[in-house]
Amino acid sequence: MSADILQKSREQDDSHYFERGDISKYVTMNDHLGDFDCNEVRKEIRMLLAHGANLDQQHQQQPHRHHGGLTRTISQPAQLIQQQQQQHQQQQQQQPAVASLVTITENLGNMNLHRKLERTQSEPLPPQQPMNTSRYKTELCRPFEEAGECKYGEKCQFAHGSHELRNVHRHPKYKTEYCRTFHSVGFCPYGPRCHFVHNADEARAQQAAQAAKSSTQSQSQSQQSSSQNFSPKSNQSSNQSSNSSSSSSSSGGGGGGGNSINNNNGSQFYLPLSPPLSMSTGSDRESPTGSLSLSPTNSLTSFPFHDALQHGYLASNGAKSNSSASSTSSASGMGLGMSMGIGQGMIIGQGLGMGHHGPATPPESPNVPISPVHTPPPYDVVVSGSGAGNNSVGSKQLLQKSVSTPMQQEDTPRLPVFNRLSSGVEAYQQQSNLGL
């Protein structure tokens, strides 16, 4: 719209049109114009002009638009308009209800959280959150150490005392090098959890922990090796004891037979002294006697010594009554085997190490492996026999294991078993001397 007043006059029925912007004024002038006052008309025209000037100023201040916006109106039925209004009102009513529900659920959730914090025992973790087992029970529980109680109880992931504290699997180089940050700046952000050494106390503590760990590992290894070595030895000793008992019974029962005498004359019996020595382990180095032990299942204490002495005594009495017949009795105990002929009562004492010829040992068993720590003990074979005739030939064999080292042969005390044997042999020797 232009700012000027457009005045159009059209002579038609003596009428004039005045157009000004959006405001129009129709003035009719006819022959009865004399009835109206001209001054009032002029005043109205001036007011209209002033109003138009104000409108022009307002249009100049606002952004100028050359064309007005094109708008189209589409008529809709009144029912659709009412339905839309009702739906809009329902949505507005539902929105506050949903908001109130959300606030209620949030409040309930906060209440549950507060209840969980107030409980003395925590609930079990859901299966979706796995527990970190690498740090489980590796640190002491501070509330338990300070107050003596913990609200989590047995489900606490920290140790309630030193007995529950577990060792952490550290890197081999843990706490073996100095912390560059601590020694250059004087501060380390990791603090006591740093993997490097901050002072000498930490290094000493780490060395002590490593030494204790290595000692426990060595002890466990030695126990395992000793248990492994003990199982085959016990089995072999039981087999040897059963074999020796059967041989002693068979030889003692056939004392009066001539065939057994001829077969046993001039023969030597080699019986194994002890179970084969295994390769040296930690347990072998610690014990001065090698594989010998005083356990009730070992072969050293499971042989009948008194039965052997009784068989020898009966054989000597048989020699007095019948000098032409010979009998052989063999008894094995603690790896000791002996064969006796007629009239050789003194041979028993010599065979047990108490005779005139001194101690003697049989040759080495072929089952004994060579050990780098315990070398095979020396063995000597002494065969002594005196004939009461051409058919009486006595052969004996003394089995005795030497001490693990030559230097300990004189210092090591004798076992109680040998003391009992020596006392029994002395009594038997005195009886045989009196009988002869």
From Swiss-Prot:
GO molecular function, one term: DNA binding
Protein name, entry field: Protein TIS11
PANTHER family in the cross-refs: CCCH ZINC FINGER/TIS11-RELATED, PROTEIN TIS11
Inducing stimuli: The zygotic transcript but not the maternal transcript is moderately induced by forskolin and tetradecanoyl phorbol acetate.
Compositionally biased region (Low complexity): 205-250
Coiled coil: none
Residue span of region Disordered: 205-295
A GO CC annotation given for this chain: cytosol
Predominant localisation class: nucleus
InterPro entries assigned: ZFP36-like (IPR045877), Znf_CCCH (IPR000571), Znf_CCCH_sf (IPR036855)
Keywords: DNA-binding, Metal-binding, Nucleus, Repeat, Zinc, Zinc-finger
Domain of life of the native organism: Eukaryota
Species of provenance: Drosophila melanogaster
GO terms under biological process: 3'-UTR-mediated mRNA destabilization; negative regulation of gene expression; positive regulation of nuclear-transcribed mRNA catabolic process, deadenylation-dependent decay; regulatory ncRNA-mediated post-transcriptional gene silencing
Subcellular localization: Nucleus
